[in-house]
Amino acid sequence: MDFLMSGLAACGACVFTNPLEVVKTRMQLQGELQAPGTYQRHYRNVFHAFITIGKVDGLAALQKGLAPALLYQFLMNGIRLGTYGLAEAGGYLHTAEGTHSPARSAAAGAMAGVMGAYLGSPIYMVKTHLQAQAASEIAVGHQYKHQGMFQALTEIGQKHGLVGLWRGALGGLPRVIVGSSTQLCTFSSTKDLLSQWEIFPPQSWKLALVAAMMSGIAVVLAMAPFDVACTRLYNQPTDAQGKGLMYRGILDALLQTARTEGIFGMYKGIGASYFRLGPHTILSLFFWDQLRSLYYTDTK
């Protein structure tokens, strides 16, 4: 039941935040491996990107990739939050004094995140391809011509096999390790600290909301460079064997980006990342916490 509640919580958040994921993906691919000032900026900021995409691609384009996004969130977070929830309920994340251990929480969050992200990697790759697809006048990054999630998965599988479907999976793991460990460690530690200070009642929804807000800020700051590199790894063009033509891996993507675009290139789309990851983290953790509270209250 923990896995089902975790997946549903993440899907609930995804419906609201997917347009921000589209904007974030476009901004991360804009000016890829080009020096600042040498390329046309189709998307000047988050709000301009929203208007531009809606005007040129149509309002429906702001929900591009929603199907794979929902499936990925259900698989990835169902496994990640579900596994973490079981570890927490089993007392494995607590010290002898009964308080949360930040180190154990971070380790559990990282391991749970790796399992979910690796299994869901093909879905995330297709999501990235679909969200990057745009009209030629505002296109950024390599443009795949997928018609939908199932067509894309079938085509990639037929051309490149399982290796092609899981291309970039290992490179995407550092992003998830950093993000998941930061998110769950910060969320649990903040909840524990606020409970000790008795700012809110133990089962108050406000406790979960404030902890989720703090977690969202921490995740965005820690995860941004890895998120940019991951988006580019998944979206790069490939040769006949399905091998990426631009980057050899996550480290190469980070180094090339920093060398060509400067340190700020590694934080492209951070505004969109915050507007997306912040609400997504808050909503998914809040829904997860409330669903678990309702379930365990009703089953007592």
Swiss-Prot record:
This is Solute carrier family 25 member 35. It is found in: Mitochondrion inner membrane. Pfam families: Mito_carr. InterPro entries: Mito_Carrier_Antiporter, Mitochondrial_sb/sol_carrier, Mt_carrier_dom_sf. Coiled coil: none annotated. Solcar repeats lie at residues 1-90, 100-193, 203-294. The chain crosses the membrane at residues 38-58, 59-79, 91-119, 169-190, 205-225, 277-300. Belongs to the mitochondrial carrier (TC 2.A.29) family. Putative antiporter that exchanges dicarboxylates and sulfur oxoanions across the inner membrane of mitochondria. It comes from Homo sapiens (Human). The lineage of its organism: Eukaryota, Metazoa, Chordata, Craniata, Vertebrata.
